[in-house]
Amino acid sequence: MTDASYARSEYLRALLWWLPLYLLVALIAIFLQPPIPLHSTRALAVAWDMWVHHQFLVPHINGAPYSEKAPLLFWLIHAGWAVLGVNDVWPRVLMVLIGAAQLILAQSLARRLFPEHAWIARTTPWMLLALSFGFLYGLQIMYDGLLAVWVLGAMLCLVPGPRRASPRWIGFAVCIGLGFLTKGPVMLVHVVPAWLLGPWWCTWAREQRARWYALGIAAIIGGGLILAAWVIPAIEASGGAYTHALLFKQTGGRVVNAFIHKRPFWWYVPWVFVLTFPFVLWPRMWAGLFALRRPLPAGLRMLLAWLVPAFVIFSAFSGKQSYYFVPELPAAAILMAAAVTFLRTRGGWASHSAWLGAWPLALGSFAAAALLFALPFLQNAGKLHDHWLHDCASVGAPFGVLYLLLGAFLLLPGRGKLRRIAGASLVGTAGAYALFALAFYPAFDMRPAAQLLAHAEAQGHAIGNLGIYDGQFEFAGRMTRPIDRLYEGQFLQDWAAKHPHGLVIAYPEHLDANTLRYARMVQPYRGVWMVIWDAPALATLRRGQQPAESFTPTILLPAPSYWRYGEVK
C-alpha cells in the first residue's frame, strides 16, 4: 500500500465513528419540530418568495427586496426544490450536510496544521460536534454554518500541505467569493487577519513575503469579482433603494452606530464561555491551555492569528450577535484539541489526574436532572411563576433520567474521556432541544396560523401585521401576496375600514378576556402571544367599544385547556 492510499484509508477510518453519530443525532433533532421563527422561517420565506415569483437574482421577502443577506443559501435551497419540489425537508437536510462538511474540513485543517500530531486531527471533529452552541445553531436554517464552510476552505488553501508549501490562491479566491455570496463582506473579517499575519505562522509567507501579499490581494479582488458578478445585475434589476441598503446599510450599519443588535464592546467576553461549552467545564482543557509554552508551534500561531483578531474586530463592531462567531468555532475546536494533545504528550500529573477529569460536567448533568425532577413538585406547590419552567414541568421527568445517565456515563473510568465528553454533550444538547420542542412547541409552530392566513388570502382578503413582520407565515402558508405592516391608532382604524374582511395579526404581552372572546385565533408566540383578529373587531375594541359577537368561537392553541388561559382575567 502506498503512503497516499494508506493516508486515505486512515482518513476514511477516522470518519467511521463521529460522522455517522453526528448525522444520526442531527437529523433526528432537526426534524423534531417544524422550522421555527425567526431565523429558519425568515430564510424559508425569502427562498419561497424568490421561487414563487421566479425572482432568482434579488432576494425578496414579503414582496420586497431583502438586502440583509446575499443569495447563495437561497440558491442551494432552490437547487433541492428543483429536484424534489418545494418542501421543508430539503432545507433542513442541507443544514445537516453543511454541519458535516464543517467537521470534515476542520479535521483536514487540523491535519495540515499539526502533521506530526495525528491525535489532534482525530479529536478535532469530536470537539467540534460537542460544542452545544454550534450544534444548536446548526439546526436552524441560517447563513453562518455555510459561511463557516467557506472560511474553512479558505484557511485550507492558505495552510501548507504535505506536498505543496505555497498557498492555493485560486481556491482562496473562490472561497472568498462564495463567502461573499453567503453573507457579504463580513467574510473578510474571518479570513483576512490570518492572511495578513501569514509571515508569523507560515514559512512560505516569510520567505516569499512580496508574493504572499501580492497574490493574496489578487485573490481577494478575485473573490470580489465573484460577488460583483451577482451584485451588478442585482442592482440593475432592483434600483437605487436596494443598492443603498445592500452596499451601505447591510454591512456598514452593523459596523458603526448599529441600527440593530447594538451592544457594548465587552459584550462577547461572557459569550466565550457559552460558545466553548461543554469544554469550558473540563479542567483538563484549561490545564492544557495554560501549559502552552513559547515558542508556539506554527499551527497554534495560525489559530491565534485567526481567532484573536476576529474577536477584537467583532467586539469593535457596534452590532453584535453571538452566532457571528460560528465560523470561528472550528478554530476553537482545533485549539482545544491541540492543547489537550500537548498536555497528554508531555505526561505527568496533569495528563491523567482525576481532579482534571469530567466531574464538573457530570455535576452539571446531575444538577439539570435534579431540576427537571423537582419541577413538578414546585409546580404543585405553586412555586413556579415563570411560564417556561411551568411548561417544562409536565414533560421534563424523562429528560431528567437522560441527564442522570449522562452524568454517570461521564464518571466512568477508563480511556476515551474526550470522546465520552463529546458523545455525552451531543446527546445532552439534542435532548435539551427535544425538551424544548415538546414543552414549547405551540409557541414556535407557525403552521396553524399560517393555514388560517393562507385561507383568508385565497378568498382575496387583506392581511395586516401590527409591527415588524419577519416572514414567519409566508413559507408555512405558501402565501403569495404581501402582508401589510400596520400601526396603532388612526392607521389601524383606516385600514380596518378599507378592509372589512381583513385579518390583523398582533403580538400582545398579556391577554385579556376580550381577546379570548372576540379574536379569531390565539396562541403562545415565543415570549409573548400571537392573536389573529378580524380587522373590524380589533378596530372596535381599540375605540373602546364592544364588537359584535362572532359566529365562530376563538381558536385557542395549543388547546382551550392550556393552563395559561385559565389565568386570563
Positions of the model-derived regions?
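Transmembrane-helix signature of polytopic, membrane-embedded enzymes
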Residues: 11-18, 106-130
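Transmembrane-helix motifs of polytopic, lipid-linked glycan transferases
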Residues: 93-116, 153
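Extracytoplasmic catalytic/substrate-binding loops of multi-pass membrane glycan-assembly enzymes
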Residues: 32-58, 64-76, 86-89, 239-240, ...
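Membrane-interface transmembrane helices that cradle and orient dolichyl/undecaprenyl
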Residues: 111-114, 154-169, 179, 340-343
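Loop-to-helix entry region of an early transmembrane alpha helix in multi-pass inner-membrane enzymes
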Residues: 71-75, 84-104, 141
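Transmembrane-lumen/periplasm boundary regions of multi-pass, lipid-linked membrane glycan transferases
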Residues: 45-48, 136, 182, 187-322, ...
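Short acidic/glycine- and proline-prone juxtamembrane loop motifs at membrane-interface regions
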Residues: 136-147
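Membrane-embedded architecture of ER/inner-membrane glycosylation machinery
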Residues: 2-7, 11, 170, 174, ...
